[in-house]
Amino acid sequence: LEVLLTKASFVLGSLWKLRINIDGFKSENSDELVTQASIGRSFQLIDCLRSNFKDKEIIDRVKVRLLEDDYICWFRFSELIHQASKIESWESELFTEERIISRIPEILSWTKAAKKMSNEYLWGGTIGPNFDCSGLVQSAFASSGIWIPRDAYQQEKFCKNIALDIESLGEELKPGDLLFFGSSEKCTHVGLHIENGFYIHSSGVTDGHNGIEI
């Protein structure tokens, strides 16, 4: 018997699978988009619906942890009602280095196809056609069943650093390598290497192309 998410079935710590695409926000009262979750993704309820008794207002947000990338955000509860199915357990799938490498060609093909679609840069975008930089990279790998962290600085910490000679950079980089930009304190941008030093990325209006470009 399928159990759908409602106020009656709301239990902290319970696990659910999405039946819709949904936006994830920075906090319970912020409209800043930080991620998006697509149909089929799983999440855990980690905080209850909040009520603002002073203003007699119910805050329509629930705090969740997305299981595939361990990312925490807030969903609009009204969008979740009857749109998430209860699951009893969830396990991550482990990939060997060889298995990941074997999927790089299809990951690159997916990214190039995303570039051909009409798109623009969207902070917090991970579903498409509009992405932010790390959302594009995460979604590219997820298209082949490989989940990596959500944000660029998290992806940098997750990956293995490679020492490169700047003069032969294009020769040493391999297709599928991630390129990180920013300061020594924190990475602020990421791109996906294609070949010969060229990389594909989604960049904003101020410092980029307002969308996906090579």
Task: Provide a role label for each language-model segment.
Residues L1-E2, R61-E97:
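Short, structured interface segments
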Residues I127-S144, I148-D151:
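Active-site nucleophilic cysteine motif
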Residues P149-I214:
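...with weaker cross-activation on analogous glycine-rich loops/strands in unrelated enzymes
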Residues E106-F131, R150:
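Active-site nucleophile-His-acid catalytic modules used for acyl/amide transfer and hydrolysis
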Residues L33-S78:
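SH3/SH3-like beta-barrel superfamily modules
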Residues G13, G40, L173-G176:
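Loop/turn positions that initiate beta-strands
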Residues V3, A8, G13-I22, K26, ...:
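Aromatic- and glycine-rich peptidoglycan recognition patches
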Residues K17-E28, Q154-L164:
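Short, structured beta-strand/loop micro-motifs enriched in basic residues and often containing a Trp
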